[in-house]
């Protein structure tokens, strides 16, 4: 699959444009964004909606308390049910095959990511990046981090990963350096 990152602050119009323009077939979103996601599905090619929640990654008893905090913080709580095109990430992971998928990619030609521009000159444009593009960009960052010891660093991610700079300089570099985040 090809990743299309999106800004969680996008309006319905911006999200709908990006999903339709990219031809996305699956959207993975946090539960608090579910109401917005459901409003943009028409006029897109989205076939599956996968929803995850912060509470899914909290230890007991915080996972039970969090929905109350969420309701207080956002003014609503979201109850998402596994039905139709909507799937819960935790359920997918529970029933997923544990055997690795064997697939072949051409790192120079196959797209890994469609990164949308900021849209400063009109509608945002999808920039097509191959696997090799991402490796090259991350390798350039790696040169700047020459003092990092592979496998021993802890990287604090303060940049948004949906932005290409945060994805490259934090997320992908952390993987390349075998670091913790």
Regions from the PLM with identified roles:
Residues 2-91:
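Structural core segment of the AMP-binding/adenylate-forming
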Residues 7, 158-163:
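Conserved AMP-binding
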Residues 79-116, 123, 148-154:
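Conserved pre-ATP/AMP-binding loop-to-beta segment of ANL
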Residues 115-118, 159:
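Active-site beta-alpha turn of Rossmann-fold NAD(P)-dependent dehydrogenases/reductases
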Residues 119-120, 178:
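Conserved G/P- and acidic residue-centered "switch" motifs that form tight phosphate/ATP-binding loops
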Residues 135-154, 162-181:
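Conserved AMP-binding/adenylation subdomain of ANL enzymes
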């Amino acid at each position: 699959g090809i990743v299309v990152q999106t800004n969680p602050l996008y309006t319905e119009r911006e999200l709908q444009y990006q999903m339709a323009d990219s031809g996305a077939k699956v959207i993975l979103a946090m539960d608090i964004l579910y109401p917005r996601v459901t409003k943009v599905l028409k006029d897109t090619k989205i076939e599956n909606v996968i929803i995850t929640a912060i509470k899914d990654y909290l230890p007991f008893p915080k996972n039970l308390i969090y929905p109350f905090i969420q309701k207080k913080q956002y003014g609503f709580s979201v109850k998402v049910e596994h039905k139709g095109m909507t799937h819960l990430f935790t359920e997918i992971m529970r029933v997923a095959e544990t055997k690795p998928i064997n697939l072949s990619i051409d790192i120079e030609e196959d797209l890994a990511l469609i990164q949308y521009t900021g849209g400063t000159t009109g509608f945002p444009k999808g920039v097509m990046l191959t696997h090799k593009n991402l490796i090259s960009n991350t390798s350039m960052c790696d040169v700047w981090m020459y003092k990092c010891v592979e496998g021993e660093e802890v990287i604090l991610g303060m940049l948004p990963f949906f932005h290409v700079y945060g994805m490259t300089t934090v997320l992908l570099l952390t993987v390349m350096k075998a670091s913790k985040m």
